[in-house]
């Protein structure tokens, strides 16, 4: 009898252990299924690529690599010598055009005063000449304004608060208008993108709270889902010969869930965390 009770006790203990293990496994599975998470996350930021509006040799670089800059701080300057000459030339042209305009207008007034003596064609010609001179004067003023603007743009300033990154510009380098010479990471633009499996998207909604863990820090960041990506690449969408779709002739029976980018806006930033664009992150979306 004792042996039977002992055997039943062992069976009961085993069944209890299995039941507890099953319950724990179910709880973890449910949490995994209803709390989307991914280790495939990245810290992102807007990188402002700054190009000059005028071309010329760089005369001064006012910043260092990885330096903090405020909006409006000078980054570098282009040699302004030829730009100053352009301003002086435009000023001289404005003065010449102004004198010509005044002379033509005076001639038109004098012709108008004696219109009974001279022909109407002569009056019209002098009036047209005065109008053309006035238009030329306005054109000279515009050219002067453009020359002054180019001179002002010889000094390149930061449009945002942030960090100079990957600086390779040196005095003496030639800067071409429209060609990026300095890049700045906008300090106020950091966000996190998490790549979630498509099977988890049904549990992700805009506005839901997100917990972010960075690989290099112990503290967690808190944010919320700002948006969900609406498109990812398709390898079968390439264009082949004759403009026809180039569809892969083979199909793998092992179907892996596609990953969709989810943008996370950061809400709280613990002290001591220095965000760097490109850092690895794990992201969990709260129920």
Q: What residue spans do the PLM features occupy?
A:
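Membrane-entry signal-anchor segments at the cytosolic-membrane interface
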Residues: 1-19
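N-terminal beta-strand block that forms a small beta-sandwich/beta-barrel module immediately after a flexible targeting
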Residues: 17-64, 68
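Hydrophobic alpha-helix/coiled-coil detector that fires on Leu/Ile/Phe-packed helical surfaces
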Residues: 26-35, 189, 195-202, 209-221, ...
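Extended amphipathic alpha-helical segments
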Residues: 34-36, 85, 89-92, 96-106, ...
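Short, conserved beta-turn/loop elements at beta-strand boundaries and strand-helix junctions
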Residues: 47-48, 63, 169, 228-234
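Extracytoplasmic/periplasmic/luminal assembly and interaction segments
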Residues: 59-103
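Short, solvent-exposed secondary-structure boundary/capping segments
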Residues: 231-244
């Amino acid at each position: 009898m004792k042996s039977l009770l002992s055997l039943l006790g062992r069976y009961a203990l085993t069944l209890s252990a299995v039941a507890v293990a099953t319950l724990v496994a179910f709880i973890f599975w449910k949490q995994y299924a209803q709390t989307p998470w991914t280790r495939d996350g990245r810290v992102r930021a807007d990188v402002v690529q700054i190009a000059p509006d005028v071309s010329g040799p760089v005369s001064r670089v006012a910043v260092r690599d990885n330096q903090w800059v405020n909006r409006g701080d000078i980054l570098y300057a282009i040699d302004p010598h030829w730009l100053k000459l352009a301003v002086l030339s435009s000023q001289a042209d404005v003065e010449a055009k102004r004198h010509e305009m005044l002379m033509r207008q005076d001639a038109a007034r004098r012709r108008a005063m004696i219109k009974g003596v001279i022909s109407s064609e002569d009056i019209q010609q002098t009036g047209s000449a005065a109008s053309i001179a006035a238009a030329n004067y306005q054109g000279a003023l515009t050219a002067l304004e453009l020359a002054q603007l180019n001179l002002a743009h010889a000094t390149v300033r930061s449009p945002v608060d942030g960090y100079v990154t990957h600086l390779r510009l040196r005095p003496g380098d030639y800067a071409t208008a429209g060609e990026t010479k300095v890049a700045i990471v906008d300090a106020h633009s950091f966000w996190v993108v998490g790549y979630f499996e498509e099977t988890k998207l049904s549990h992700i909604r805009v506005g839901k709270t997100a917990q972010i863990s960075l690989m290099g820090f112990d503290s967690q960041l808190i944010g919320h889902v700002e948006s969900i990506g609406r498109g990812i690449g398709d390898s079968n969408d390439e264009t082949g010969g004759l403009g026809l779709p180039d569809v892969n002739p083979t199909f793998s029976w092992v179907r892996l869930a596609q990953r969709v980018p989810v943008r996370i806006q950061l809400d709280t930033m613990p002290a001591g965390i220095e965000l760097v664009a490109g850092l690895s992150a794990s992201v969990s979306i709260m129920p």
